C-alpha cells in the first residue's frame, strides 16, 4: 500500500545475527501505522514470546556472554529433564540457556548447528482457556510448560505455553 516502515537493527557480536546473542531492533514506524490485533487476536489470552531457549555447547561461556552484553543479574542454574540439559535462567532477561548433558536431540542439534534457539515459550494469561489440545506437560528452569503438538520441521515439540510472570 506504499506505507513506509522503518527500524534500526544492530548485532552485539560478529557472525550471523541472533545466533548466540540476540540482535537488537527498534521500530521507528509510528504506532498508528503498525499492524493492530483485531477480532479473536485482540482478546486472545496468548501474549507473545515470553522466553527463548538457546542451545549452547558451553553453559559458562554463554552465561558470561549474556552477563557482559546485558549487565545481567546472576542466573539461576538448574537441570532440565525435558531437555536433558543444564540450564541457566536470568531473572532480568527473557532467555534460558541450555547445555546438553547427555545424548539426544538437543546434543545432536548443538553439535550440528552450534548455538541457536531450540525452543520458544509463549506467554499466556494465567488460568486462561487458550483452546489448544494434545499438550504435553513439562518444565524448563523451574517453570511449568505446556508443550504444543507442533513438531515440524525439527521432529520434536519446541513451542510451549507458560503462565505470564
Predicted stretch roles:
Residues 1-76, 81-165:
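Glyoxalase I/VOC metalloenzyme domain signal
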Amino acid at each position: 500500500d506504499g506505507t513506509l516502515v522503518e527500524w534500526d537493527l544492530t548485532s552485539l557480536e560478529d557472525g550471523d545475527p541472533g545466533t548466540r546473542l540476540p540482535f537488537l531492533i527498534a521500530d521507528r514506524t509510528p504506532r498508528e501505522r503498525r499492524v493492530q490485533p483485531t477480532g479473536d487476536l485482540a482478546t486472545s489470552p496468548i501474549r507473545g514470546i515470553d522466553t527463548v531457549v538457546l542451545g549452547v555447547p558451553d553453559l559458562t561461556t554463554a552465561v558470561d556472554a549474556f552477563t557482559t552484553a546485558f549487565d545481567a543479574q546472576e542466573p539461576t542454574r538448574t537441570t532440565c529433564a525435558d531437555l536433558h540439559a543444564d540450564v541457566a535462567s536470568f531473572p532480568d532477561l527473557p532467555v534460558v540457556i541450555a547445555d546438553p548433558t547427555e545424548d539426544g536431540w538437543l546434543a545432536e542439534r548443538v553439535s550440528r548447528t552450534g548455538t541457536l534457539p531450540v525452543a520458544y515459550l509463549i506467554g499466556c494469561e494465567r488460568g486462561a482457556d487458550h483452546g489448544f489440545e494434545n499438550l504435553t506437560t513439562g518444565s524448563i528452569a523451574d517453570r511449568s510448560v505446556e508443550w504444543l503438538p507442533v513438531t515440524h520441521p525439527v521432529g520434536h515439540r519446541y513451542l510451549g505455553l507458560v503462565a505470564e510472570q
